[in-house]
Design a protein with these regions (language model features):
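Acidic/histidine-rich catalytic cores of soluble enzymes
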Residues: 1-60
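C-terminal accessory extensions appended to soluble enzyme cores
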Residues: 64-69, 74-129
Length: 129
């Protein structure tokens, strides 16, 4: 998994320096990527990490958001995890197994599921008109 500090391991660093030595798949962390890009866009880093997984296995990704932004409190570390996920997860057309990293655990999952279901229903209604 990529780190959440610019001075540490980006997805590209892990791919170049560890994956080629070990063959162990990379887990992409969306939240960490915001702090340690390694010069890659989110999509590029996600695709690079996904390329390390066998084609018959869905890549695992970690999804979380900043607690400081959620709470509107600049005193909280930006890397700290929020209670819930507010924004839709951008998959760039790929399938992943998503692991949520939220303080509210199962409640966060249920809330995100409701948001996705509602969004899907809205899209369905617009396209069926």
């Amino acid at each position: 998994e990529n780190d959440d500090k610019a001075s540490m391991w980006s997805t590209k660093d892990i791919y170049d320096k560890i994956y080629h030595e070990t063959g162990i798949e990379l887990v992409f962390d969306y939240h960490h990527h915001r702090f340690c890009t390694g010069g890659l866009t989110e999509q590029e880093a996600l695709e690079l990490a996904a390329s390390t997984w066998p084609p018959w296995v869905k890549p695992v990704v970690h999804v979380s958001e900043s607690r400081a932004i959620e709470q509107g409190d600049p005193k909280i570390r930006k890397q700290a995890h929020s209670d819930y996920i507010k924004k839709p997860v951008e998959s760039y057309g790929q399938n992943h197994d998503i692991m949520l990293e939220c303080k509210k655990k199962e409640l966060a999952l249920l809330q995100l599921r409701a948001q996705v279901t509602e969004r899907h229903q809205q899209i369905k209604e617009k396209t069926c008109l």
